[in-house]
Every structure is written in structure tokens, then in C-alpha cells.
Amino acid sequence: MHVKRAATAGFCMGVGLALKKLDRELDNNAKDIATLGPIIHNPQVLRRYEQKGVRCYTDPAEARSGQRVVIRAHGIPEETESALAAAGVDLVDATCPKVKRAQLGIARQREKGRTLLLFGEHDHPEVQGLLSYAGEGAVVFGSLEELQNGPLEDDRHYFLAAQTTQDKHAFTSVIEWVRRRFGDHVPVLDTICDATRERQDEAIAIARSVDVMVVVGGFASGNTRRLAEVAQAQGVPTYHVETPDQLPLDAIRGYGAAGLTAGASTPKSIIDETQKLLESL
């Protein structure tokens, strides 16, 4: 089988920086390292760090004074970070710079008295962190339809932002509707990162030129799920797998050309293995 592999597949800048910071702590022989939540959304990578002794705390209360704790790439709520610092926890901030920029941009709009409309996944850790910078009244929505049916008030001064890994085309539709509803003066923060845009555009282009698409990455990874969604929207059969052994070989064996892309937290080794398996069909 011929395979068209996306040039943008694999670790993004934010993931790479976060893992470098965690690796640096391990290289410095720190004995008591933990992350606050999964540092990235890839179970194979997380398993590797667990084998090196890195613990993953789901509850901030697990962190102890003096302990080295790495903040996940998705960021954490502002009040959680402040409480941990006040408790004497030695924090290493591995928040993606694009997420940090979104957090600070939202905080500046809050100071101007504006209310956030956030396009994102309600339960995603990045979204929970962004909301903590927004103040009261923020509205989270996962689709334009949800926003249209949401609790919007005519006398509020809104601004728009998106989870950094959201679908840029869907966000454009949201912007257009909000400005028709509330006026062109509604501020829009440019929070969808360049890597997300580039990956989605390349996934769309490849999907339009192949018989089947394979997207590799963690099932909990929002950006990976979005890649699968935009590829499938082109009308091509699309399979989202975490590892090559999850590929439905009987279902894809008869196709002539396969497209291959991967989420921002997918290691190159797994992408390589998937490509090799596809090419053997």
C-alpha cells in the first residue's frame, strides 16, 4: 500500500518543550518527581515516564511541600498553581507557551470587564485552566449550535477565544455568528495555535487524495480527535488508533493509498511503526 505521511505528524513545540523539562529533572537526578495530571495525552509516553519513577497526581493535594512537581503541558487552573506555590511545592511550569499566552490574554480581557465565550471541550484540562483566568459568567461550548442555544445576555460585553487545539474552520463559523449577533466590536483572541492549523490543513489535503486515512494518537488527545474529525469530514474512511496493532487490517487491506497523520503528542517511533505496517499491506 502506498502511504502519504503528513510532514506535520508528531510532537509539536509545546509537547517537545514539556518533555524536555521533565527529562531535565530526571537528568538532574531528582528523586521525587511528579506531574500534576498527565504531562501529555499519550499513554505510551506516560508509561515510559512511570517506569522511570515519575508519579502522576490527579489531586493537587497529593503534592507535598518541597516536592518537585511539573505542571502539565495543558496548564492548570490559576488558583491551583497559587495554592501549590503557597504550600511550598517546588513547581516546574511545563505549560505550552501557546496555552500560557491564551491564559494571559483571557486574564487581560477579564480585567477590561468582558465575559469569555470559550470554544472548547468542557472537561478538557486546558479548558479548565483557561476558565480560571476568565472570571465569572464564562460560557464554554463545544459547537456553534450549543452556543446558539446557550445562556447569552444582550447586556454583557463578550469576547471570544478557543481551546488551542480546536478546529479552526469551526471557530471561523463561530466568529461570524457571534459578530452578527453582538456586533463586529466583539474581540476575538487568536488562540488556536499555528501547529494545530497546519496539521488540520495538511490532514484535509491528504484525505482528499487517498482512499483511507489513519490518525495515530491518544484517544484522550483533543488535537488527535480533531484530526480524525476533519479527515473524516472529507468523506474518506478514517481510523483513529493509538498503536499500529489496533489497525483493522482486514478493513483497510484492499485500499490503494493511505494517508497517515498523528497528534501532537504521538512519538515518532509509533508513527514509523504504523507507516511500516501500512506499507506492508
From Swiss-Prot:
The keyword Repeat does not apply. GO terms for biological process: dimethylallyl diphosphate biosynthetic process; isopentenyl diphosphate biosynthetic process, methylerythritol 4-phosphate pathway; terpenoid biosynthetic process. GO terms for molecular function: 4 iron, 4 sulfur cluster binding; 4-hydroxy-3-methylbut-2-enyl diphosphate reductase activity; metal ion binding. Isopentenyl diphosphate binds at H41, H74, H124, S221, N223, S265. The keyword Oxidoreductase applies. Keywords: 4Fe-4S, Iron, Iron-sulfur, Isoprene biosynthesis, Metal-binding, Oxidoreductase. It holds the Pfam family LYTB. Dimethylallyl diphosphate binds at H41, H74, H124, S221, N223, S265. Its cofactor is [4Fe-4S] cluster. Binds 1 [4Fe-4S] cluster per subunit. The active site is at E126 (proton donor). Its EC number is 1.17.7.4. It is an enzyme of class 1 (oxidoreductase). (2E)-4-hydroxy-3-methylbut-2-enyl diphosphate binds at H41, H74, H124, T164, S221, N223, S265. Coiled coil: none annotated. Pathway: Isoprenoid biosynthesis; dimethylallyl diphosphate biosynthesis; dimethylallyl diphosphate from (2E)-4-hydroxy-3-methylbutenyl diphosphate: step 1/1; Isoprenoid biosynthesis; isopentenyl diphosphate biosynthesis via DXP pathway; isopentenyl diphosphate from 1-deoxy-D-xylulose 5-phosphate: step 6/6. InterPro entries: LytB/IspH. [4Fe-4S] cluster binds at C12, C96, C193. It catalyses: isopentenyl diphosphate + 2 oxidized [2Fe-2S]-[ferredoxin] + H2O = (2E)-4-hydroxy-3-methylbut-2-enyl diphosphate + 2 reduced [2Fe-2S]-[ferredoxin] + 2 H(+); dimethylallyl diphosphate + 2 oxidized [2Fe-2S]-[ferredoxin] + H2O = (2E)-4-hydroxy-3-methylbut-2-enyl diphosphate + 2 reduced [2Fe-2S]-[ferredoxin] + 2 H(+). Catalyzes the conversion of 1-hydroxy-2-methyl-2-(E)-butenyl 4-diphosphate (HMBPP) into a mixture of isopentenyl diphosphate (IPP) and dimethylallyl diphosphate (DMAPP). Acts in the terminal step of the DOXP/MEP pathway for isoprenoid precursor biosynthesis. Belongs to the IspH family. This is 4-hydroxy-3-methylbut-2-enyl diphosphate reductase. It comes from Oleidesulfovibrio alaskensis (strain ATCC BAA-1058 / DSM 17464 / G20).
